[in-house]
Amino acid sequence: MSMKILVLNCGSSSIKYALYNMDDKSVMTSGGAERVGLDGSFVKVKLANGEKKQIMHDIPEHTEGVKFIFSLLTDPEIGVIKSLDEIDAVGHRMVHGGEKFNKSVILTDEVLKAFEECSDLAPLHNPANLKGVNAVKELMPGLPQVGVFDTAFHQTMPPKAYMYAIPYELYEKYGIRRYGFHGTSHRYVSARACEFLGIKAEGTKMVTCHVGNGGSIAAVVDGKCIDTSMGLTPLEGLMMGTRAGDIDGGAITFIEKKLGLDADGMSNLLNKKSGVAGLTGGSSDMRDLESAAKSGDERAKLAQDMYFYRIKKYIGAYAAAMGGLDVVVFTAGVGENQISMRSEVCKDMEFLGIKFDESKNNVRGEEAIISADDSKVKVVVIPTDEELMIATDTMNLL
């Protein structure tokens, strides 16, 4: 019997899933419940043959969502397995593991207690991740479950990279430091880029750019992360769809006073109303931004310039931090698909050893080398596959 692993990613109002056949690492079926706990909840299902279905279903909370997803997996019409007993284990995306987790682990009661203690670091995500784990526990007691942490890959950062220059007791008392996110993606693409280029991770200095609606960059030396752009929360670093990224702390207190905002109001402004959407007063989607900029919208053009510039700056900074640069990787929704972003970011970077080839850059969502043949630094596009990484980690821990 082939091993089958179910991957779950529970957000505050969504549950994404994928069922893997680990013999050939293929996706048997995948989908997601959306609007969990809200009116008009539904589940999207993608079958192995590529056919898509949308099913309206009332999902008041996560346990009901997981239960319904289980019923779809064994459904006589659209299911892909005869019985839930065919599932060997469940792998979960866990957002914030704090300093407690530097690798994927089997989710024992002890582990879950430690994870719960990290909840104030990710008050939206961690409780939702836990709900997914508890739902599986309730529905299929005894089924092995594995946690794969977004923060784990970045736990190799040295203190000089992760500490903030604030009173030290804030770190000791509350764990305030840089943690970084998208770690599973950075880990996957950094390893995959080496395979794709036929090089060893040892001795390679790489910058991985995970650019989606949320974005982060990591400096990876010898296959290990030494710095990353997101911080205590996913708000620091790059300019994003709705997040501000790097901003002067003094500007934050200034805005709070001017607008009479409390901490929650300020957090909402920086996380939900800033970034591309905040600057343009419109969409946070880079495709909309690109067409608006092309049609002469000044503010869209400014937002786009700022967005590209911030990525370019981080690549330069991390090349300095690593003392060199061998590979730049672009991944995630924008990184894999936006040709103009890659082109602008890599422009005028010859001094760093990046020689770009526009003719090779015309790719979307596929693995490709987009630097010139004689470029000292290789620039590649590697589509990320966090779910496969989670499934693989889960299999390896059984």
Kindly give the residue locations of the regions a language model identified.
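Short glycine-rich, Thr/Ser-proximal phosphate-binding strand/loop in the N-terminal lobe
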Residues: 5, 14-60, 231
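Short beta-strand-loop/turn "lid" adjacent to the catalytic site in phosphate-handling enzymes
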Residues: 73, 77-125, 146, 153-161
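Catalytic phosphate/nucleotide-handling subdomain of diverse soluble enzymes
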Residues: 221, 227-262, 268, 332-363
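Internal helix-turn-beta structural module
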Residues: 301, 305-321, 325, 335-398
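Glycine-rich phosphate-binding loop of actin/hexokinase-like ATP-binding domains
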Residues: 153-256
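Glycine-rich beta-strand-to-loop/alpha-helix junction loops that act as flexible
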Residues: 11, 92-95, 211, 325, ...
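Adenine-nucleotide phosphate-binding core of ATP-dependent small-molecule kinases
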Residues: 268, 275-279, 286-321
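Phosphate/pyrophosphate-binding loops at sites that engage ATP/ADP/AMP, CoA/4′-phosphopantetheine
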Residues: 72-87, 193-200, 315-326
